[in-house]
Amino acid sequence: MDRLDIDKKRAIELGVRYVNIHWKSVIETEVEVSVLSGGYSSRLYLVEDTSTSKSNPIRKFLVRLYGGKIVTGDDPIRPEGGEVKETLVFYAMDLAGLGPKLYGSFDGGRVEQFVPSQMLRDVGYDQRSETMSELARKLARFHSLDLPISQERHQVLDVCEFYLEKRDFEQFRRLAHHFGFMDVSRFEDLDVKSEIQWLRKVEQLVNGRIVTISGDLNKNNILIRDEPDKFGERVMMIDYELAARDYRGRDIGQVFAYKVLEMKDDCFRICCEYPDETWRRAFVTEYLKQTKSLNYFEWDEKLDNVDHVLMEAEFFMFHSIHMITGIFINQKEDSVFYNMPADMVLSMLDFGSYFINMYHQRKALFIETYGKLLNLIE
């Protein structure tokens, strides 16, 4: 388990200052602080009052400390604005009833509401038929947020080119071999430069609406609440480190791509196949239905129809795959990977390799499906 970067005394101080004055009567021996997660650029801790007293109305809260372990502060994957931007998004989600309450913000982190919930699992889509449609509606509401953040589009392909220029395959090969991941051919054979050129060309042809996106819709960032929210829904999106202005298709494409991936026993596992067209079409249909009801832009039937948004999602999903594999390939001699459990690192390299293979398969299918429409086939 990670070492704690926050002690019990500091946890109580934050509880008193931002959560509820009753935390003043809590003593250190009655407090438990545990690690929940370490994201791209922050770490999350659960603080709990374990006393038998019933006087404390809020017995659990979360502390998020900025400063991640996989991505450094100057990594271009992080959109402009950093922690200030992320806190603004979090607060806006709170006010809109879309996410947890923001109790307070301090230098180096923030204090958040603990919402009893569990991470989305693929089986959750089957066990609860509303899950997929609720996620589609939540995403549509998120995209409609009008936020005081940079209105310039976050250029993911620029990030991918940055990774391309900085990568060192010898260092990556040593890291992979250190953990027993011997076949790195998929990573080495991916012609990133040519692929980025192709993506830049096709990006202009696909087009789509630019909105406020989450930028990181893996299942760890999608929770199923124990109790419904004000919309009567249980799906909740969290973690807005990568929120920015970009094409809506990037978020929707991530929902599709990341459906195949989830964590089990602290390792990433491929849990299912890429969602079929029926599933994808149902998701986009619900997304557009909710989007139209929000009425935050002038509707265009040529752009805002199911077929076009499906095309957007299928294309902009490619950007996310390049971004993920770029992060992996750019791990250096001082990479945090060396301090992680071997099984965890192997699982990340496995899914990186799987995603590269999925990229080639989905790209071929994209050209087959949309090649004539976009004049990609002569």
Regions found by a protein language model. Name each.
Residues 34-36, 40-191, 202-209, 232:
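ATP-binding pocket architecture of kinase catalytic cores
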